[in-house]
Amino acid sequence: MPQLVPFYFTNQIFYGFASLSVIVYLFSIYILPHYLEIYVTRIFITKT
């Protein structure tokens, strides 16, 4: 199992942080604003 070989630790840490950064960036740019717009619209509809 390459997960337990110390030679691969830095590679896994690097690609883990890189993929996590890409996921956070994509969520913050594309996915979360859409849900925020839906949430704000629902709040405005229920308060009037």
UniProtKB/Swiss-Prot annotation:
InterPro entries: ATP_synth_su8_fun. F-type ATP synthases have 2 components, the catalytic core F(1) and the membrane-embedded component F(0), linked together by a central stalk and a peripheral stalk. The central stalk, also called rotor shaft, is often seen as part of F(1). The peripheral stalk is seen as part of F(0). F(0) contains the membrane channel next to the rotor. F-type ATP synthases form dimers but each monomer functions independently in ATP generation. The chain crosses the membrane at residues 13-32. It is found in: Mitochondrion inner membrane. One of its GO terms (biological process) is proton motive force-driven ATP synthesis. It is a single-pass membrane protein. It holds the Pfam family Fun_ATP-synt_8. One of its GO terms (cellular component) is proton-transporting ATP synthase complex. Belongs to the ATPase protein 8 family. Residues 33-48 are mitochondrial matrix. GO terms for molecular function: proton transmembrane transporter activity. Residues 1-12 are mitochondrial intermembrane. Mitochondrial membrane ATP synthase (F(1)F(0) ATP synthase or Complex V) produces ATP from ADP in the presence of a proton gradient across the membrane which is generated by electron transport complexes of the respiratory chain. F-type ATP synthases consist of two structural domains, F(1) - containing the extramembraneous catalytic core, and F(0) - containing the membrane proton channel, linked together by a central stalk and a peripheral stalk. It comes from the Eukaryota. This is ATP synthase protein 8. It comes from Yarrowia lipolytica (strain CLIB 122 / E 150) (Yeast). The modification N-formylmethionine is found at residue 1. Keywords: ATP synthesis, CF(0), Formylation, Hydrogen ion transport, Ion transport, Membrane, Mitochondrion, Mitochondrion inner membrane, Transmembrane, Transmembrane helix, Transport.
